[in-house]
């Protein structure tokens, strides 16, 4: 399992398929945002005074993330997206 550092967050993207004229199009290929589930969260970042600022998200949260943000990584058979917390736009409730 991936353990993110600092303010980084590991996400599992929810893939949606869309059919147009019999062709399957990746659902997120043209969207500005993606929906994802938080898998793991780093400890946060430190301020200039050394105070630790904890992340706003936690494992299990469903979030909205910028479409082209982060780095795709593989862990075994699973593919995850590793992003900075700043790339997460909202928690979906």
Swiss-Prot record:
Molecular function in Gene Ontology: ATP binding; metal ion binding; protein folding chaperone; protein-folding chaperone binding; unfolded protein binding
Zinc listed as a keyword: no
UniProt KW keywords: Chaperone, Cytoplasm
One GO cellular component term: cytoplasm
Principal location class: cytoplasm
SUPFAM superfamilies: GroES-like
Positions of disulphide bridges: none
Localization, UniProt: Cytoplasm
Pfam family, one: Cpn10
SMART domains: Cpn10
GO biological process: chaperone cofactor-dependent protein refolding
Residue stretches spanning the membrane: none
Function (record text): Together with the chaperonin GroEL, plays an essential role in assisting protein folding. The GroEL-GroES system forms a nano-cage that allows encapsulation of the non-native substrate proteins and provides a physical environment optimized to promote and accelerate protein folding. GroES binds to the apical surface of the GroEL ring, thereby capping the opening of the GroEL channel.
Family: Belongs to the GroES chaperonin family.
Listed name of the protein: Co-chaperonin GroES
């Amino acid at each position: 399992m991936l353990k993110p550092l600092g303010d980084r967050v590991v996400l599992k993207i929810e893939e949606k398929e869309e059919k147009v004229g019999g062709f399957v199009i990746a659902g997120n290929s043209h969207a500005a945002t993606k929906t994802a589930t938080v898998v793991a969260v780093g400890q946060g970042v430190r301020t200039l005074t050394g105070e630790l600022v904890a992340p706003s998200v936690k494992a299990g949260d469903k979030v909205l993330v910028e479409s082209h943000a982060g780095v795709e990584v593989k862990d075994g058979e699973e593919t995850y997206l590793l992003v900075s917390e700043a790339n997460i736009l909202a928690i979906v409730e």
